[in-house]
A protein has these predicted regions:
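Signal-transmission coiled-coils
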Residues: 33, 37-44, 51, 61-66
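Conserved small/polar residues in nucleotide/adenosyl-binding loops
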Residues: 1-5
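Metal-dependent catalytic cores of enzymes that make or break cyclic nucleotides
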Residues: 52, 56-240
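Juxtamembrane or sensor-core-proximal signal-transducing alpha helices
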Residues: 7-42
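Short, flexible segments with low predicted structural confidence
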Residues: 11-12, 19, 47-48, 102-103, ...
């Protein structure tokens, strides 16, 4: 009887000890997993930061390549962000995607010869056809960027129109993502408000009139009216 009790108590103690060690093992494993998850999160954040730095560097390099549109990409990104925030329908994550995609909307111009990109005058038909290809080239460059979904669409479609009369594919409103509609308007806004080799910048009233005429045709109706409102309130083109 005594031996049996001793056996049971010994067995109980062993089980308790094993349980304690197992729980400690689990705790250590959980701590290790948390540390590993933390390390992975830090590594992913570092990778994302490197990607963002690369995006910024590429946009700056692109602006430097095009002598007539210095800081164009940055302005388009800033205008796009202002328009998006005025729409009150996007998340903070969406704002980042819109801003960074806008920074790269003209990345395909890297493949356009400098003699065409910086020509001091209007382009010939042949040169214009080459210039138009920057949209497709940009899409090819950006299509595999996982951290910037739809950035390729911003590059490909930012010269498309709501009425289907744009390029490169002539697609219409229902096929154009909101990101594209925003970037397209911001790109046109900067084009009109900047000095070009063949013309001076347009005044505010002219730009407002162009967005009024283009609403529902060239531009998304909602986006066009937001741009007009921001200009009239002095939140856009305040220095123009």
């Amino acid at each position: 009887m005594y031996k049996r009790q001793l056996f049971y108590w010994s067995f109980f103690v062993i089980v308790v000890v094993i349980d304690i060690f197992y729980k400690r093992y689990q705790m250590n494993q959980e701590e290790n997993e948390k540390e590993l998850e933390k390390d992975v999160a830090i590594a992913l954040e570092d990778r994302k930061k490197l990607m963002i730095d690369a995006v910024t560097a590429i946009s700056q390099m692109l602006d430097a390549k095009d002598g007539y549109t210095q800081q164009h990409s940055k302005r388009v990104a800033e205008y796009s962000l202002m328009i998006a925030k005025s729409m009150n329908k996007f998340s903070d994550k969406d704002y980042k995607i819109i801003y960074r995609s806008a920074l790269l909307h003209d990345i395909g111009k890297i493949a356009v010869p400098d003699m065409i990109l910086n020509k001091p005058g209007r382009l010939t038909d042949e040169e214009y056809n080459i210039m138009r290809k920057h949209t497709v080239w940009g899409g090819e460059i950006l299509k595999d960027l996982e951290f910037l979904p739809d950035a390729d669409k911003g590059a490909i479609y930012h010269h498309e129109r709501i009425d289907g009369k744009g390029y490169p594919y002539g697609i219409k409103a229902d096929e154009l993502p909101e990101l594209v509609r925003i970037i397209s308007a911001a790109d046109s806004l900067d084009a009109m408000s900047s000095n070009r080799c063949y013309r001076k910048q347009c005044d505010k009233q002219y730009i407002i009139d162009e967005f009024k005429k283009g609403a529902g045709r060239q531009f998304d109706n909602e986006v066009a009216h937001i741009v007009i409102s921001l200009i009239e309130k002095g939140e856009l083109l305040s220095e123009a």
